[in-house]
Amino acid sequence: MSMLCYTLIIAFLIGIWAAPKSEDNVPLGSPTTSDLSDTSCAQTHEGLKTSRNTDQRHLAPKKAEDQELGSAANIIVDPKLFQKRRFQSPRVLFSTQPPPLSRDEQSVEFLDNEDTLNRNIRTKRETHPVHNLGEHSVCDSISVWVTNKTKATDIKDNMVTVMVDINLNNEVYKQYFFETKCRNPNPVPSGCRGTDSRHWNSYCTTTQTFVKALTMEGNRASWRFIRIDTACVCVISRKTDNF
């Protein structure tokens, strides 16, 4: 009987000795579960860093390319900026297509540097009753849609940058200016047409007025009053040799 008890005790001890060791009994230098987790996290972090660096290397040329283009069409404008716009002028137009002809249907030229828009749009001057009576303009003027105005003088006599293209609601709009200027400072040899050259000196000159346009202020778009050509007038002065 005692022999059977000794046999059972020895078998029990052998079973305990052969059982798997717990994590607390792992020798120093053996990789525990926490060490494996840390190693796995570190490898994952390194993989993410490598992936990010690779993505940045692929994106860097594209960003540099965008900076080299420097297109004003990349400037995104908040639509709320147009809700705050006041003192609107019919001579300033934002459109995705070439602007319409002048309302009085006078000779209008549409000018642009791009090949797709490099064309002239002209309409014949509508016959007006006053022209049949022999009436003529004192000065000859020409009206032009300006599509590439980049610089202008503001109301404080400062040179400002005018936005040509803007990105509004994922659409590219151009800013057009309808300008009028003199065709010739001396339509007739004596100066302005119809003046008495015996008593008056005269010449035609282009005058300007202020319109509210979208300009760049630092890195932001803002409204400013700028000067544009709007009329052709006759300037006269009395000849002093008659006194």
UniProtKB/Swiss-Prot annotation:
Look up the signal peptide feature and give its range.
1-18
Which GO cellular component does the record give, naming just one?
axon
Keyword Signal among record annotations: yes
Which cysteines pair up through disulfides? They are 139-204, 182-232, 192-234
Q: Name one GO biological process term.
A: modulation of chemical synaptic transmission
Residues folding into a coiled coil are: none
Q: Enumerate the PROSITE patterns for this protein.
A: NGF_1 (PS00248), NGF_2 (PS50270)
UniProt keywords, alphabetically: Cleavage on pair of basic residues, Disulfide bond, Glycoprotein, Growth factor, Lipid-binding, Metalloenzyme inhibitor, Metalloprotease inhibitor, Protease inhibitor, Secreted, Signal, Toxin
- Name the Pfam families for this protein: NGF
Q: Which residues are glycosylated?
A: 148
Give one GO molecular function term. Answer: toxin activity
Q: Where is this region: Disordered?
A: 45-66
Where is it made, tissue-wise? Expressed by the venom gland.
- UniProt lists compositionally biased (Basic and acidic residues) regions at 46-66
Protein's cellular compartments:
Secreted
Q: What are the residue ranges of the propeptide?
A: 19-125
Q: How does it assemble?
A: Homodimer; non-covalently linked.
The entry's family comment says: Belongs to the NGF-beta family.
Its function, per the record, reads: Nerve growth factor is important for the development and maintenance of the sympathetic and sensory nervous systems. It stimulates division and differentiation of sympathetic and embryonic sensory neurons as well as basal forebrain cholinergic neurons in the brain. Its relevance in the snake venom is not clear. However, it has been shown to inhibit metalloproteinase-dependent proteolysis of platelet glycoprotein Ib alpha, suggesting a metalloproteinase inhibition to prevent metalloprotease autodigestion and/or protection against prey proteases.
Protein name stated in the entry: Venom nerve growth factor
Starting at the broadest rank, the lineage of the source organism is: Eukaryota, Metazoa, Chordata, Craniata, Vertebrata
